[in-house]
Amino acid sequence: MRQNESLHYLDNAATTLVAPQVADAIYKTMTEHWGNPSSLYGPGQASRRLLDRARAAVAATLGAGTGEVFFTGCGSESNNIAILGAVEPRSAWGKKIVVSGFEHPSVVLPMQRLAEKGFEVAFIAPGPDGSLDGEAFLAAVDRHTILAAFMQVNNETGAQVDAAALAQRIKAKNPRTAVHVDGVQAWMRVPVSLAGIDSYTVSGHKIHAPKGVGALYLRRGHNIQPPYLGGGQEKGVGGGQELGVRPGTENLPYAVGLATAASLMHENAARRTPHVAALNARLRAGLERLPEVTLNSPADAVNEVLNLSTNCVRSETMLHFLETKGVYVSSGSACSRGAASHTLGAMGLPPRAIDTALRVSFCGDNTEADVDALLAGLEEGLATLARLQ
């Protein structure tokens, strides 16, 4: 899938290159299946059947039923639908929400909006290593808690949580609490079990599908009130576009693209998983030669993400220096451009570590040459740039 051997792209947690097979599937769908899936005549019904197959393919990767998966425009939209949709039907018996303190903005901002409306939102800080403190999270859940939300894999540090285990403990403490999990960085990278989980978010452009498509798992029987309305929703859940969960004519080509990407990721997992683990280990070993560098990711973080701090060169300065070497990393979440990392801040890291942090994120197409180019760039940058600051 690599297009340029001199380009060392190591920011796959921000976005991934669209797989050629995915692009081909999208183009074929655009040109051959142009009918509206809601139409009752032939071309529309052909599109409906293809949409159903795409839904079934995505559902299979989650271990979900076909009727439990809904296509959306992105992971952020999925999070908004799940969070805002779950609160309204439960507000009569509770006003408390428990959420991890290092979530994606598409979770944090809806929570802030709900707090402004009078809901009690308890943010649970991560431990010093960036991992979710499951015991503290569980302790915050009480009989008034209507929603608990956390991400399975943190997008900045790669810290991961056993989502199903925590969800089941939450349900054991309060069966009425809705449990939402942001699985955008976890899907197709770590095993997914939906036990105890009411809603689960995935995104296309993290797995070599295009930007602009995601999906939302909603457990059968999980009651939500969709936050916005549109075509077909007058029929209620069980009819209309995306069964009334998300209005608008379905983006069939991108739904097919998402399903194709998920299938490719599943097929390549046996090769990709150990390969990425080896790249992560190579990077960690190489960083040991750079005494200024400290690691911010926990030891058991997913292999796809490694967060580090140079502690002497500001992130933006080092990022642009590495770019001159053909190496591309990020200073944190691409959705919070220019802002200090609230994840690293929640971990209690000192300002210098936060201001000099870099996130490296792998995909299956990365190579040892990518890692070596990054290490060489960091070594040169630390030797030259540190004297300038």
Pin down the residues of each PLM region.
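Pyridoxal 5′-phosphate
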Residues: 1-389
